[in-house]
Amino acid sequence: PEQTGSTGAYENVELVTEGEKAKELEAQGKTEKEIAARTEPILGGAELTMLAGQTKAQMMSFLLETKKGGLIVVDGGWWDDADYLKEQIKKRGGHVSAWFLTHAHTDHVGALLNLLQSEADGEDTGITIDHIYYNFASLDWYKKHELGDLGTADAILTALAGLPKGEACPVKKGDEILVDDVCITVLNDRYEPDDDHVGERDGNDASMVYRMLVNGVTILFTGDLQVDGGNHVLETVAKEDLKADIVQMAHHGQHAVTKEF
């Protein structure tokens, strides 16, 4: 799929995990006490990594390693981010316990689509996935509200439909998924505007919101929510449920939800 996303103004930077930071400090000759003071675990032994994009376009890709070694992926990025994503997954054992998708835009599902289509073509990618969780609108909805992303929606829905029974898992508001000691809650119903409303980026507002409870720390993933979708969440989800210690800023931190969110 063609990459047409807006370009980011940031360098290709990847977050450093607590374990990697400890190794770096040890190499610098720091004492155990100094290392402990500068690498206090935020997630109680789990590690969250925000992967850097491999193109100049904005994307979203997160890996969460549980304390017990399970791996959770959120979105994954563009088609051209797939090789780097596969490399990072393999570094963590090559097995994904749960893959969560926020919405069917190429800068979020392209890498997974690349992976699934490669597997369907007979390639051994070296990656195994237990379950993929999603809630996408129908193709008729995309024809009405976001014709420009119809191709991506069609491709990812087709790929998911071709998976073995039980691997592709549609979700709804209130669903809870357990991966080791991590609890993931689906907070919202997908926002669907009235048929007479055709927004500029309705597919962004259709993002699913996932709350992850990781060893007492709450992480909120908001996808690409913008004003209408964000307001829908505020109207239908208890404010207490939206409170979080770590928040993925909606829509790459720009043109997103309101300040009230």
Stretches with model-predicted labels:
Residues 95-107, 247-251:
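Metallo-beta-lactamase
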Residues 237-261:
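Long, structured stretches of catalytic cores involved in phosphate-ester chemistry, encompassing
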Residues 103-109, 181-185:
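Conserved long hydrophobic alpha-helices within structured protein cores
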